[in-house]
Amino acid sequence: MTTQVMSKNGTAAADDLGNIVELEHVNVTVPNQILATWFYIVGLGLTRDPYMNVSPLNMWANAGGAEFHLPTRGPQVLPGHIGLVLPDLEALKQRLGSVEQYLQGTRFSWTAKKDHVVAICPWGNEFRCYTPGAEFGDMVLGMPYVEFLVKPGAAKGIAQFYEKVMGASPVAVKNGKDPVAVIGVGHCQELRFRETSEPLGEYAGHHIAVYVANISASYDFFEQRGLIMEGMRGHQYRFKEIVDPESGEPLTTLEHEVRSLQHPMFGRPFVNRNPNQTQGGYRRGEDAFLTPV
């Protein structure tokens, strides 16, 4: 779907970004902030945002340049999994092992695979954790992708939706046993929608937040079709129905918090700590984890 423009240095189009410039956060509600802290902060080694939502009823957990928003309500489990890039999988394994005793009786588990670690949160959300590598560009800590499971036959229409309605690029459909739509949503970030024949439960209410350069075109599309969930307010709007851009057929449900680049939080720097820093083995000057700007 992307026109390849060759230059002396190779494929110039490979450096293009589309209208979606950043996947900023994934929001899933959790019923217990203490268990969430054991998993996201102690286990995964992420960083509780020191500036925003510091009450006991919500937590923003930073992962490089992205976040998890974890307000207190009944648990939301998204169909699929979340990809993470973490700097040290051996340290991750030690941390996950250390929290097992505190997460007994929940759905928490973890498994070391050949090239990644699978971690399941106390309520069933799946995380696949990798070390930095070429497939993730220059990301050394962050959320490179989120993969959602969708009904058979939906991938092509979803790809067309993101390309034509949201202006995303690059957009591709990888065919095979389980076709998957791959949507570029900023520097080293993707949304993936993989077809499955397995039964899919009802939409749980989770959402994602993205920043877009042109917000009016997609807003007009949804407004004309009565698909706006929350109108423009504070430089953002919300929708949740992904539809075929031609026929209007519903393809999947995923709430999007769509923010313009005029939003005051665009470009907000995220604090990330060094999770290997401990009181017993303290190393002066190594409290912070520094990510490339």
Annotate each PLM feature.
Residues 2-19, 25, 49-50, 90, ...:
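Vicinal oxygen chelate
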Residues 44, 166, 226:
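Glycine-centered, phosphate/nucleic-acid-interacting loop/turn motifs that mediate DNA/RNA or nucleotide
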Residues 148-149, 155-159:
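Histidine-/acidic-rich catalytic cores in large beta-rich domains
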